Amino acid sequence: MDYYTILGVAKTATPEEIKKAYRKLAVKYHPDKNPGDAEAERRFKEVSEAYEVLGDAQKRESYDRYGKDGPFAGAGGFGGAGMGNMEDALRTFMGAFGGDFGGNGGGFFEGLFGGLGEAFGMRGGSEGARQGASKKVHITLSFEEAAKGVEKELLVSGYKSCDACSGSGAKTSKGVKVCDRCKGSGQVVQSRGFFSMASTCPDCSGEGRVITDPCSECRGQGRIKDKRSVHVNIPSGVDSGMRLKMEGYGDAGQNGAPAGDLYIFIDVEPHPVFERHGDDLVLELPIGFVDAALGIKKEIPTLLKEGTCRLNIPEGIQSGTVLKVRGQGFPNVHGKARGDLLVRISVETPQHLSNEQKELLRKFSETEKAENFPKKRSFLDKIKGFFSDFAV
């Protein structure tokens, strides 16, 4: 279903209107207000997914342009939409009300619960098992690479899982024990009104376990600094501003937590001949006034394998006329029909004429007829009428 429809707002809605609509629906369908109601839980995840996209300017722009699948369907799409579990939906919920999962939040929930540090089972704290940070890199492609698609190797700096302890943070399996306070759950639960709040266990920082004999290689963190090569397959048809998400290619998490994601932002270099407008290509083709008058067939460049195609320019063509060559444009990133090549004709007036050339043009001018220049005749007729209106 369309995200705007899910939130009940128009496509022209302001960010404030989108946020207001989401807050109203999120409170209505929150699982703590609807215990055991599977449909309410589904709707809560659904509105959270919609807000995750429409509440972010960049994601919203991509959604408006390409739809729900995004330009990189199968590679992450909007990078965050798709509430597969309640934790993601609750994180979106808290963010919309000004909450912060690290215990530094304010706004609505802090006022409601009195300094809420952790809520609804969200894991936070300054220590313990935390998901690895996401990484962001920019990659510049040539115009041809964007058209054909390309494979690239990127060198990414960050953290990888510690090989010595397999990411556990402990020297041996005996160097870890279950947390006595939370009994391994990583959370301590409190009830206030109809809300049940699960805050991070202060003894194990939400990990559910305590490392008694830390790994000497990573000092109990479960990860170490690293540089690695990442192979990226970029599809044909990409454009500047598009984003590719590679799940799990960011920093490794601490103490066995999931890795973050890698976001690759695309920049495409301009082309010396073509301009891109969506999936269409625009080519400015200068021709002489004789060719424009008599018509001509010309070989013009394309991005296809053949490299050129023949264009039939009809006689009497005017400067600014656009001729369309179907299917010779840019490939569509979704695999749909290729765009068209739009050839804009530019009739060039000759310069630096010889005396002989000037004489030939004068002779041609003497043979001119009104039907040779319909625009000129139309203009003269108009100004005759204009001056006659002011005749005394």
Swiss-Prot record:
Residues that bind Zn(2+) 1: 162, 165, 215, 218
Positions of Zn(2+) 2 binding: 179, 182, 201, 204
Subcellular location: Cytoplasm
CXXCXGXG motif repeats: 162-169, 179-186, 201-208, 215-222
Any one Gene Ontology BP term: response to heat
Domain J stretches: 2-67
Cofactor entry: Zn(2+)
Entry keywords, A to Z: Chaperone, Cytoplasm, DNA replication, Metal-binding, Repeat, Stress response, Zinc, Zinc-finger
Highest rank taxon of the organism: Bacteria
CDD domains: DnaJ, DnaJ_C, DnaJ_zf
Any GO MF annotation of the entry: unfolded protein binding
NCBIfam families in alphabetical order: DnaJ_bact (TIGR02349), PRK10767.1 (NF008035), PRK14284.1 (NF010877)
Quaternary organization: Homodimer.
Family designation: Belongs to the DnaJ family.
Protein name: Chaperone protein DnaJ
The organism of origin for this protein: Chlamydia muridarum (strain MoPn / Nigg)
Lineage: Bacteria, Pseudomonadati, Chlamydiota, Chlamydiia, Chlamydiales
UniProt gene name: dnaJ
